[in-house]
Amino acid sequence: MFDEKWFWGLVLRSYAKQVAELGIDPRSFAAYHRNHINKCMVVAFTAFAFVDSIENGGVAFKLGIYRAEAHKVAKQMVREAVRQADGRIKYCGPVVRRKGDLYLVDCAVTGCNHGTLDNPKFPLKALFENKIFPDVEALVGPGGQFEGHIPIFQGDNAGPHADAGFVEYVEGYCRSRGWHWEPQAPQMPHMNVLDLSVFPSMSKQHTMLCRDKEGLKVLTEDQTWDAAEEVWMVLENWKIASAYIQAYRIAKKVIAAKGNNGFLGNGDGIHVGVRRDFQRTENGMVRIDGNVIAPPAAA
C-alpha cells in the first residue's frame, strides 16, 4: 500500500495546554500566510504478509519512505542569508551553490513526467521501476523472506496514480508476474492503511519531535524531512499490522452498508475489535483464540 503526505515545518495545536502554574507559559505564533510555513511531501510504502486470510494475522513491514525531490540547475550564485544588526536579512554569507550546479529541490509528484531541469518533477514510475518493484521481487521471489506470496498493490485515485503512462506500466509489470494492481475506490481514505492509521500517528509524533528539537519555530524543508524520516524509522510494525486488519474489517462494514459510509459517523464507526481478537508480536499480529481462518473462496 502506498500514498503521499505533506509534512509541515510548523503545526500549531489549538488545544495545547497553557497553564502558567505548571510551568507551561502561554506562547503565540503567527504566520502572515500558510505558504510561509515550509513543508515537504513524502511517499510511503507499507506491506502486510499473511496466509489464507487477513483474519489469521500476519507480519507487517515498512517498504520505505521517500522525499518527493529532484535535481534542479542553479541559474545564479546563491549565498547564505545573514541577519543584520537592524533585523534585516542580507545574502552575504558563504556560497551555497554556483551557477550551473545541480541541487535537490522539493517538487510535485507525477505519474511519469520527469519535468525539466528548471522545473523538475518526482515521477512515481521511476520509483517503482528502480526501487519498489525490485524490493518486492526480492521478498517474494526464490529465497525471499516471503517466497511464494502474491503481492497486491493498492493506492488511491490521486492524479499521479491515475496517469495513463504510469498505470499502463505498473499494470503490465504486475500482470507479467502474476501480481495484482488494485486501486481503492474513490473517496475512501478509511480503506487505505496509511490514511487510516499510519499518517495520523506519524503526524502527531512528527509535531512532538519538531517541538522538542526546535521549539516554536518554522523548520526548514530539510529539518521537516529529517523529523519525518526519524518518526518513520521508530514506527512499530505491529501498529501497521493492526491497521491492515482494521481496514479489512471496515471493508466488510462498507459491503454490508452497500457502499454507504454513513456508519463512519457513529461512535464505533472505525472500531472493529482488533485489540479484542488479536495480540501483537514484534512485527505483526496473531489471533488470540488460535483459530485458523480459511481463505475467503473456501469459506
Give each language-model segment a name.
Residues F2-E4, F128-K131, P142-A162, E182-V193:
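Acidic/histidine-rich, metal-coordinating catalytic segments
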Residues E137-H149, D212-T220:
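Short helix/loop segment immediately N-terminal to the Walker
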Residues A164-R175:
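Short, aromatic/basic amphipathic alpha-helical patches
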Residues L194-A299:
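C-terminal anion-handling pockets and recognition modules
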